[in-house]
Amino acid sequence: MIEIQAYKMDGLGNDFIIIDRRKDKIDLSKQQIINIADRKKGPGCDQIIIIDKDKEKKTNAKITFYNSDGGETGACGNGSRCISYFLMSEKKLNKSKINTESGILKAKLTGKTEVSVDMGIPNFDWKKIYTKNYSEHCQFVGYPQSTNRHI
């Protein structure tokens, strides 16, 4: 069993385990991620968020999101707000940029503990958005995808 320092944050009902690897390199296997996210085996969460240094130094940090099934995924809106607040709080900033699989996301403090994140342009191509039970005959579905698929 390994011991790691982690933080738990909540953003509008989604909860996250945050692991900061900027100082100590911690490699987690897919099974370890699953166990940490499992509410019966570990602290449990919707997603695990890993903080790494941005090697290109264009952003405050490189962020990787993992779903509870252990799979890496794109940026989550609520997770991006939580991690941006975490990063801004430690440096007493009111703006931040995070480098994610979904691109570089800009965040700003809009209140004492409120954060707004520009998630970029949403995907309106419903055939490329993960959905269940849709009809191949449907011509238009009226919803965009602006973040990752949650398991």
Model-predicted segments: where are they?
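ATP-dependent small-molecule kinase catalytic core of the GHMP/sugar-kinase superfamily
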Residues: 1, 92, 99-151
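A glycine-rich beta-to-alpha transition motif near the start of alpha/beta enzyme domains, typified by
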Residues: 1-111
